[in-house]
Amino acid sequence: MKSAFTLSLALVAVTATISAAADDNCSFGCLDVYKPVCGSNGETYSNSCYLRLASCKSNNGITEAGDGECASTPASSATPSPVTSSTGSTSGTVGCPDMCLDVYDPVSDENGKEYSNQCYMEMAKCKGTGYDDNKRSGNPGISTLDAERKLAFAPGYQGPPCGDMLCPDNYAPVCGSDGETYPNECDLGITSCNHPEQNITMVGEGPCPSQEQQQQQQQQQQKL
């Protein structure tokens, strides 16, 4: 009887250790981009990154069953839909996106109503409203919000979170510490994400100076 009790304690300790390790390795973040995928557990996830996050926390027990929302959510599930934001907030309507990227790429539904992009149209249909917080008239603009998004990566995580980052198609050049000019800060962030060993950071707004310009700047500094 004593041996059985000791064995039970050992199993509990091993389980707790595995759980703690999983939590440590599953601390990466995901972008709030609504590109739903269906998990093998019948749950809909905002995007493939959120599915990988849930799978990581369940010891890789969830796989991607297909693109788009699941046909139905299991009635026995007592937990809310895992369609959440990176801050942990959950959508008020199961399976509906909480937010969309502030990118102007207008689309119209079957009734001719125009939305700023596909995500806002899907949000309105899902919630049964005409909601389109990003609706614009006149000259379209692009928020810098998505350019400022960052992902936290867990040590040893083997997934490709950099591939889930999306950038606006706007030209707001910045100069990187590697001497390269990037279309915008978000594009620089993706390159930095894909090449962490280079530790690329933004050194200034606008294109990087050419070699000739650098030489002229050095000459002017020497004269001073």
From Swiss-Prot:
SS bond list: 26-56, 30-49, 38-70, 96-126, 100-119, 162-193, 167-186, 175-208
Task performed by this protein: Secreted effector that interacts with and inhibits the pathogenesis-related P69B subtilisin-like serine protease of host tomato. Inhibition of host proteases by a pathogen extracellular protease inhibitor forms a specific type of defense-counterdefense mechanism between plants and microbial pathogens.
Glycosylation sites: 25, 199
Principal location class: secreted
Residue ranges, compositional bias (Low complexity): 71-92, 211-224
The keyword Disulfide bond is assigned to this record: yes
GO CC terms of this entry: extracellular region
Residues of the signal peptide: 1-22
Compartment(s) of residence: Secreted
Native organism: Phytophthora infestans (Potato late blight agent)
The name this protein goes by in its record: Extracellular protease inhibitor 10
Pfam families for this protein: Kazal_1, Kazal_2
PROSITE patterns from the UniProt entry: KAZAL_2
